[in-house]
């Protein structure tokens, strides 16, 4: 099913810097494609996503692209850009 608004749980590494993370879709579905949309990362930096319980980022993403369910985060790497 194609959805334009998806709720995603992202396991992050470092909440102290909160500068943005390099995320990857499920490898089987997307070949480890990086989520690189600037608007998403800008929203993360501006604090539009709710941080809760340790290293989990709860994000209601209104996607600028169409994606198929399920969207799963395979792995997360630390900050991809600085101040």
What are these regions (language model features)?
Residues 12-14, 65, 80:
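A generic structural motif
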Residues 1-38:
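Long, positively charged binding patches that form subdomain-scale interaction surfaces
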Residues 5, 73-76:
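Hydrophobic residues on conserved beta-strands that form the core of alpha/beta folds
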Residues 8, 48-71:
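Flexible glycine-rich surface loops and low-complexity tracts that mediate binding to linear polymers
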Residues 77-83:
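Short peripheral tails and domain-boundary helices/loops at the edges of structured domains
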Residues 40-47:
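Short alpha-helix capping/helix-loop boundary micro-motifs
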């Amino acid at each position: 099913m194609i959805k334009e608004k998806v709720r995603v749980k992202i396991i992050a590494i470092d909440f102290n810097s909160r500068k943005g993370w390099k995320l990857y879709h499920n490898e089987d579905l997307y070949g480890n494609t990086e989520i690189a949309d600037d608007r998403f990362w800008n929203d993360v930096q501006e604090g539009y996503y709710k941080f809760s319980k340790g290293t989990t980022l709860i994000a209601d993403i209104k996607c600028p692209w169409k994606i198929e369910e399920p969207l799963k985060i395979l792995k997360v790497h630390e900050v991809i850009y600085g101040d």
